[in-house]
Regions:
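Sec-dependent signal peptide hydrophobic core
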Residues: 18-26
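C-terminal segment of N-terminal export signals and the immediately downstream linker at the start
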Residues: 3, 7-13, 26-62
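Flexible, low-complexity segments enriched for small/polar residues
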Residues: 42-45, 53-56, 60-136
Length: 136
């Protein structure tokens, strides 16, 4: 019985990690990385600009602490680059028409503008309190 539990736990661990793995081409070879590993390795973004990445990370960090280091921007960027039918982003389930990138980019631009109007600086330069006040 303990052997069965061990196999089950190993299978569960494998499925959990492989579901979040993303494929990157590095030096002509495909690498499977988690969003956190992709962020740590500073993998280039395919869709989002540097400003969009910094805005997304700070907003997400205000909502879900730890999301920046977990690689939220790498995950979103990777999903935006996927075929719409393969994307795991909520826009797909809310009836948005593909491509999804403009929807996310317009939202990030609006968030950036709101921070500039209210605090006279980009969202990525706001204090934690200021950032949370815009999210609340």
């Amino acid at each position: 019985m303990s052997r069965d539990k061990k196999i089950h736990a190993t299978r569960r661990s494998f499925l959990k990690t492989s579901a979040m793995a993303m494929s990157y081409m590095v030096g002509g070879k495909a690498l499977l990385l988690t969003p956190a590993a992709a962020r740590a390795a500073q993998m280039p973004m395919q869709i989002l600009s540097t400003l969009e990445v910094s805005t997304l990370e700070v907003i997400c960090e205000a909502i879900v602490p730890g999301s920046r280091s977990a690689g939220i921007a790498a995950f979103v960027d990777y999903q935006l680059a996927e075929k719409p039918q393969d994307a795991l982003l909520m826009g797909r389930y809310l009836g948005l028409e593909p491509p999804f990138a403009p929807f996310y980019q317009q939202g990030l631009a609006a968030a950036h503008q709101a921070a500039l109007e209210q605090f006279d600086r980009p969202w990525s330069q706001l204090t934690e309190t200021q950032s949370k006040s815009l999210v609340d």
